[in-house]
């Protein structure tokens, strides 16, 4: 009995320490990386506002405006694996900086896009933004889990992702209010502001002291240790033949189709039916 009671303070101490969400030395990195979750949530939510705006300002069909979402997510599809390879070789910080640079450049490309009045040029800009966003997500999600005790990693990730939701809420209200309240409003304006802000954040990430949780050598060594015999080809075959994994991929694929389709075209359903104006629709996110 005495032995048990004697162990309790030590056990409780470990439990209290393990329950700390973020280590003290990682608070600043956690705040900076969490801000990225807000950034890409904001950027993705703007797409639904852009869809309706371009239909009105450029007199394009719903089918053609759907290329806004398609082009952005093609960037996700094509850049996902290269992003993982880059981060494995270079580390999390270079991955974040690369993602922010692509995002910022794509946003600033809206300026010449508006001068040219070319919808296709806007699509190229959105493709670059999509490439940047997937690099950001690939770097930030695993990095945020490493900034503290492993037992609290899910809580850290959930907290960071809540700011992603906040970005999704605010983007339609802010950008939709700008674009729909004034027919002559510049679509380049919000993207210019966002591009400058994102490039500023990239500069901060270049100079602020951030812990590189896993060095390049550690990541490569871990990947080599965990990889099955036969290399990448064997790993891919192992995944494809895993029924649970493929079922998960299929479920995510169907979920994304449903989510993106509803978010993209519900504004048309609500406004064309006369129930809401484009401006009042943006307030639904609140």
Q: Residue locations for each model-derived region?
A:
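Extracytoplasmic
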Residues: 29, 35-54, 262-267
């Amino acid at each position: 009995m005495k032995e048990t009671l004697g162990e309790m303070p030590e056990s409780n101490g470990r439990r209290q320490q393990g329950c700390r969400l973020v280590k003290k030395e990682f608070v600043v990195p956690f705040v900076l990386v969490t801000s990225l979750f807000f950034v890409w949530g904001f950027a993705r939510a703007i797409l639904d506002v852009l869809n309706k705006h371009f239909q009105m300002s450029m007199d394009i069909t719903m089918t053609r405006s759907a290329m806004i979402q398609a082009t952005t997510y093609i960037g996700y599809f094509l850049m996902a694996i290269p992003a993982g390879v880059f981060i494995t070789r270079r580390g999390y910080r270079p991955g974040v900086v690369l993602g922010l640079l692509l995002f910022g450049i794509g946003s600033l490309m809206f300026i010449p896009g508006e001068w040219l009045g070319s919808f296709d040029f806007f699509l190229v800009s959105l493709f670059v933004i999509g490439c940047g966003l997937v690099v950001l997500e690939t770097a930030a999600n695993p990095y945020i889990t490493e900034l503290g005790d492993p037992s609290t990693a899910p809580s850290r990730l959930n907290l960071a992702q809540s700011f992603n939701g906040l970005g999704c809420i605010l983007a339609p209200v802010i950008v939709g209010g700008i674009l729909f309240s004034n027919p002559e409003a510049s679509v380049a304006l919000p993207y210019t502001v966002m591009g400058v802000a994102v490039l500023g954040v990239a500069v901060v990430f270049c100079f602020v002291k951030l812990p590189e949780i896993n060095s390049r050598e550690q990541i490569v060594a871990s990947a080599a240790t965990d990889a099955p015999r036969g290399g990448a080809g064997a790993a891919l075959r192992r995944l494809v033949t895993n029924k649970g994994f493929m079922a998960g991929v299929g479920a995510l694929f169907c979920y994304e189709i449903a989510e993106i389709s509803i978010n993209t075209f519900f504004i048309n359903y609500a406004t064309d039916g006369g129930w809401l104006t484009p401006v009042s629709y943006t307030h639904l996110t609140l």
